[in-house]
Amino acid sequence: MSEAAALVFLLDVDNTLLDNDRFGAELGDTVATAFGAEQRDRYWAIYGELRDELGYADYLGALQRFRSGLDNEPALLQMSKYLLEYPFEQRLYPHALETVAHLRSLAPTAILSDGDIVFQPHKIRRAGLWSAVRGEVLVYIHKQRMLVATQQRYPAAHYAMVDDKPQLLAEMKRQLGPRLTTVFVRQGHYAAAGEHERIEPPPDHTIACIGELRGRKLEDFLPSAPVIALAAD
């Protein structure tokens, strides 16, 4: 984008547009079936260590470390096939693509996601989201730390961020202030955990599912005009 838009929509992916929790559950079941429950727990322990180390989910990196001691297991190579051929398009939340199309009809729309540089873009493409936003995709390690770069890529007077993590939305709001409208989607385990946390500032809008945005208008995402008190005659 060369000229500043009035508004740009920024959309998260995992548990916002697609059910990543279900993917994780099915991945765990697949590992358990192939290697046993103990090895499944080992995979998730490696995954957790990598997430703490890198700051993002790295399913492929966890699999790479997981292979230690299992090189002679025929099922190991099938796990890479499972990850790369996983049908993410089937994990889209109801009306997710319709919602993206609706938002694009209102204003420029881009995906702003966290993750590794290989599997996360693959997931976005496989789900059909890359084409849905016409390739307008950003994937960072910590997107809330990349707001300057995001604004340079998509200059706008105002932004609307749609995400399932209320604390992340609050952090972004503290940085951009009134130039950002935050939309909290109550989907997934981060959203559930957020119900018991103090969120400051709170989200501007809270919705139960991504499909609700299909009924919203442009003005719903723009800052309200200030109320000016008139002097009495």
Give the ranges of each region predicted by the language model.
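Conserved SAM-binding loop
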Residues: 17, 109, 161
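Short, acidic loop-to-helix structural element flanking the phosphoryl-transfer center
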Residues: 60-61, 81-111, 141-144, 148
